[in-house]
A protein has these predicted regions:
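Short, glycine-/Ser/Thr-/acidic-enriched flexible segments
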Residues: 64, 77-78, 84-87, 101-102, ...
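Glycine-rich phosphate/diphosphate-binding loops that line cofactor/substrate pockets in enzymes
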Residues: 136-155, 213-221, 399, 420-432, ...
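N-terminal export/assembly segments and adjacent metallocofactor-ligating motifs
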Residues: 2-296, 300-375, 389, 406-407, ...
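Flexible glycine/proline-rich, aromatic-decorated loop/lid segments
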Residues: 260, 556-589
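Short beta-alpha connecting loops at secondary-structure transitions
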Residues: 265-271, 586-596
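N-terminal leader/propeptide and maturation segments of large enzyme subunits in energy/redox metabolism
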Residues: 118-134, 292-416, 593-679, 723, ...
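Extended redox/cofactor-interaction regions of prokaryotic respiratory oxidoreductases
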Residues: 2-5, 169-243, 247-252, 278, ...
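Long, contiguous, secondary-structure-rich segments that constitute the structural scaffold
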Residues: 603-647, 734-736, 740-752, 756-840
Length: 840
């Protein structure tokens, strides 16, 4: 097949290699930088030539770091990117290979130069060049026709995490356009199972996945790392893990795979993929049975003493005894009330006023309001006014009693004695638990997170230096609650999770009403690469759309399957503001260093142009500077810092906090009760599209098998290998795939497999092999690795389809998801592997 046209991209593999070789001539634009120069010392603020200028940039993909970088410009061209030196915060001075490679990304030979219209079949790679005016006219005409025929909701925008900034995360101008045409929105459904499991216990006020500042891990006595390969997935946080090791922190890695992170830890525990919740529940059982709980913390800062009615699972309140409903409850001293946090997803309600919760106070032998109790009972079974009750802690203890270490050992393949050892370490504080994105990538993914935050609750290991439990520290985000997008009203059309689109479109219904989706504008996302079950997604969703527009800088898998492709400006070709990241707690100003290349336009200008063609230009008179100023004025953090667009543009980088942040310091939680709610009174789905959920299952952390990747699954006999993902330091969620110097270092999509499994299938080390199941296949290069657990395959995620000999990872991944988390389950898939014998 060598030299033939690739249906995915319209560019042959041979043609791509020629283009890459030809692109070397363009290296003069970036100072002839070679791979060897990556290792050189790059001094901040020091131009290499007298005529060079240095601009402040922020590297802002969804790696989560938002590193400040210097953008060196010579004769109107970016010639180098280097680490910004922030003297007051040397620990955040970082840059990685991706950050260093920005000039190659900007001047990528594959960069889209002008608008393209499809002239062949979708995916054929046949395009024609058109003008921006033609493109905008076509979009306006198609959208008007579709909305007139099918309704306003039939046009939708899809965006996910293609960048972090006001324009690249909040998408204010696109959203205003969508609001004005009353269009639908589509969400990406990625990495939210951890959030559901964690935040329904602690609340959402500290941000998503909340944990202590990464610099705090050095203060832990025991550091647990769960399904997180920091050395590759969180490059900039890795140094803090190393600091902890050097300081003598006892580090334990729980991961099916022997990762680089695991190799540096004091202890590595290989757990069966998808069984993390069973392991953690067993650890809770040991902690309870051995009396290792922090009783005072349980009484004062958790729902442990709350009495749960056996009749309906809700908490016993004063109104249950007085016969007075919540709405009729007097707000006097005798029945003190509290407001449910308006943003709390546990309840799905807004500022409800509830009757006071009651507990059994052993000090006086009576029911009292929880805040008045002196010694509330955390264990016990009671009956009041004919209502049987148990404490929330009793219900937890009963649930975990099913998972003795011996029983859990059968499920998770971890020795019972090891489970006991881990449990005891969890009570020996300070203890930090850091969760990665592995255990949440299964249908049962919320429950490992829910169980782990429950361990922190029952041991009191949260809210002080060295003691935390979470997946990431996003508290430095400035929170752009913009008023710009909804200024003229919000769209009444629905927000749809991408995972539910096949079901919605196939049924033709949403919320019990007829529903049609016929056009999609996709920006800051690449669903045909980064989503799952790509063949079904194409068949049931994309092939049913009458018009697909993709805004991007290169021909992604999704762009290749669209009708119109619009070239967008790169990050250093326009101004933007970022609110900080996991290891960068600065609000940063990204200066415009160069003009947009070729005919590319900024996202704002693209949205404005479409609006003009739709007769809506009068609603888009604000400049980008005014939009950024609006974002800062609506940010509580920026207001506290006294920041405006003008002041930040002058300062460039402004710290949002001093010192090391401690999540939930002083045991302050933003749940309805103000406590850690390991028992969830009112579980709700993270993204509601009218689905049913199992409320009882979600009240407590539980174990149930993954949707597919489990030995007892009916598909296991046919496909006996669990497919697990690993992140690469050379790409970020599908970005940087075409950057030629990084492809020199990482040229081919690969998968790792235990040699015993590979040899049993006749697959040779270094050979191309086919990974397959009933959904599809992909052909990637095999790497033998003893670090991979037998019965597993580990793939490097989000490679563009054109780099495979055939297929792609997105073809073999399962669409099944939990209706509570509505989260992509990237590891919940079974496959098999066989040699690939076809020609290149």
């Amino acid at each position: 097949m060598s030299g033939s046209e690739n249906a995915h991209s319209g560019l042959t593999r041979r043609g791509f290699l020629k283009a890459t070789a030809a692109g070397t001539a363009a290296s003069a634009l970036i100072g002839g930088v070679s791979l060897g120069a990556f290792a050189s010392e790059l001094r901040s603020g020091q131009p290499e030539n007298a005529g060079d200028s240095i601009y402040q940039g922020i590297c802002r993909p969804n790696c989560g770091q938002c590193c400040a970088i210097d953008v060196h410009v010579r004769d109107g061209k970016v010639v180098k990117t280097a680490m910004t030196h922030i003297p007051d915060s040397p620990e955040v001075n970082r840059i990685c290979l991706r950050g260093l490679s920005h000039p190659y990304r900007i001047y990528d030979p594959e960069r889209i130069k002008y608008p393209l219209r499809r002239v062949g079949e979708r995916g054929s790679g046949e395009w024609e060049r058109i003008s921006w005016d033609e493109a905008a006219e076509e979009i306006a005409q198609k959208w008007a026709e579709i909305q007139e025929k099918y309704g306003s909701q039939a046009v939708a925008q899809y965006a996910i995490s293609g960048g972090y900034g006001v324009f690249t995360t909040n998408h204010p101008v696109y959203l205003r356009l969508n609001n004005l045409i009353n269009g639908s929105k589509i969400t990406g459904c990625v990495d939210m199972a951890n959030a559901v499991g964690i935040n329904r216990v602690v609340g959402w006020g500290e941000g998503v996945w909340s944990t202590n500042d990464a610099r705090d891990v050095v203060n832990a006595k025991n550091l647990f790392i769960w399904a997180d390969n920091w050395s590759e997935a969180q490059i900039q946080e890795w140094r803090f893990f190393c600091d902890a090791i050097e300081s003598g922190v006892n580090t334990i890695v729980i991961d099916p795979v022997y990762t680089i992170t695991a190799s540096k830890a004091n202890k590595w525990v290989s757990v069966r993929p998808g069984s993390d919740a069973a392991l953690i529940l067993s650890m809770i059982d040991v902690i309870i049975s051995e009396g290792l709980t922090d009783v005072t913390f349980l009484q004062e800062h958790t729902v442990a003493p709350f009495l749960v009615k056996s009749t309906d699972g809700s908490f016993l309140r004063q109104s249950d005894l007085s016969g007075t409903s919540t709405a009729e409850t007097d707000k006097g001293d005798e029945l003190r009330t509290f407001d449910v946090h308006a943003a709390n997803r546990n309840t799905g309600t807004s500022a409800e006023v509830e009757s006071p919760i009651l507990v059994w106070d052993e000090a006086c032998g009576a029911l009292v309001e929880v805040e008045k109790a002196v010694n509330p009972a955390i264990e016990g079974e009671f009956e009041f006014n004919g209502i049987p009750c148990k404490t929330a802690f009793t219900l937890l203890a009963e649930e975990v009693a099913q998972y003795s270490p011996e029983k859990a050992a059968e499920i998770c393949d971890v020795p019972a004695d090891t489970i006991r050892e881990l449990a005891r370490l969890c009570a020996d504080g300070p203890v930090t638990h850091r969760m990665g994105w592995g255990s949440q990538s299964y249908v049962n993914g919320a429950h490992p997170a829910h169980a782990l935050i429950t361990i922190a609750a029952i041991t009191g290991q949260i809210g002080y230096p060295g003691a935390s439990c979470g997946a990431a520290d996003w508290s430095a985000s400035s929170g752009w609650a913009q008023s710009y997008a909804p200024k003229y009203g919000a769209s009444s059309s629905p927000t749809l999770p991408v995972l539910a689109l096949p079901e919605i479109i196939e049924s033709g219904e949403y919320g019990g009403e007829p529903f049609a989706l016929k056009a999609m504008l996709i920006h800051h996302g690449n669903p045909l690469c980064t989503s799952v079950d790509m063949n079904r997604l194409k068949r049931t969703v994309f092939d049913q759309l009458e018009h697909i527009v993709v805004v991007d800088s290169v021909m992604t898998d999704t762009a290749c399957y669209s009708d119109l492709v619009l070239p967008v400006a790169q990050w250093f070709e326009f101004e933007d503001i970022t609110g900080g990241g996991q290891t960068n707690f600065y609000t940063g100003f990204n200066e415009k260093a160069i003009e947009p290349l070729h005919e590319s336009k900024t996202d704002s200008d693209i949205a404005r142009l479409i609006a003009e063609k739709m007769g809506l230009g009068e609603y888009f008179t604000e400049t980008d500077a005014e939009i950024l100023d609006d974002a800062m004025l609506s940010s509580e953090t920026c207001q506290k810092l006294g920041l405006s667009y003008a002041s930040l543009k002058e300062s460039k980088l402004v710290p949002q906090r001093t010192g090391v942040k401690i999540a939930f310091e002083g045991a302050k939680f933003t749940t309805p009760s103000g406590r850690m709610e390991f028992y969830v009174e009112k579980p709700v789905a993270f993204s509601n599209y009218g689905q049913d959920i199992d409320v009882e299952r979600e009240r407590l952390p539980r174990f149930f098998p993954p949707g597919e990747a489990w030995p007892e699954n009916e598909k296991y006999e046919k496909y006996p290998l669990t497919l697990m993902t690993s992140r690469t330091k050379y790409q970020v969620h599908g970005q940087w795939f075409s950057v030629r110097n990084l492809r020199e270092l990482d040229p081919d999509p690969t998968f790792r497999i235990n040699p015993a499994d590979a040899r049993a299938r006749g697959v040779e080390d270094g050979a191309w092999a086919e990974i397959f199941n009933d959904r599809g296949h992909c052909v990637a290069k095999c790497i033998y690795s003893e670090a991979v657990r037998p019965g597993s395959v580990v793939y490097m995620k989000n490679w563009a389809a054109k780099y495979f000999k055939a297929g792609s990872w997105a073809e073999v991944l399962s669409l099944e998801f939990d209706p509570v988390t509505v989260n992509h389950c990237f590891m919940d898939a079974l496959v098999d592997v066989r040699p690939w014998s076809q020609e290149d």
